[in-house]
Amino acid sequence: MKEIVSQIDAFAYNIEEGKTVRTKMKREFIFKERLNDKYMQVKFSVPNVKPGTVIEYRYKILSDFYFHINNWSAQQSIPVYYTEYDITVPEYFKFNLDMHGTEQLQTEDETVGVNLVIGGQVFQCNGRHLCFKGNKLPGLHDDNYVWCVEDYGTQVNLELGGLDFPGALYKSFTQTWENIDEALLDDSEFGGQLKI
């Protein structure tokens, strides 16, 4: 199983003599670094960056890890003028969506056609296309009363809730409150003390 990072583009925008100058990143500034025998990291360096520079970048991830979608933080430590998170998931994978934070995101949720590769075979099916967009988001700042300010930023989290393939029973990966209650009460270290 692998993830492929592709279509990396980056630009630096600077004001020079009253005009906006856009500098495109060249392919030679994209680096791959092998971390170990299983992992490789992709890095890139945006040219002509200095104080006041606006940076724009985009990339695409194609992943075999159907059970995990990376969380997305719309807010950063610096103000974000525009940010977008665009994902498509085959209809058989049921993800629970959790959005939180104080900033408003534009959200699109539509059905599209996708190709799903399983065991080398390509299947055509419907997919759920989700797109989240944020505009003019303020930067996150440290606060004396907040342990981890990033936890309070506007973000999107997706968790695999279940699999629903045709001809198979639905397989759930999430717990209901009743399941959690039962597990806690059955636990000898926790529930046993409540059954006095």
Regions found by a protein language model. Name each.
Residues 1-84, 176-178, 186-187, 191-193:
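Lumenal/extracellular ectodomains and adaptor appendage modules
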Residues 62-67, 71, 75-196:
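Secretory-pathway-linked proteins and extracytosolic
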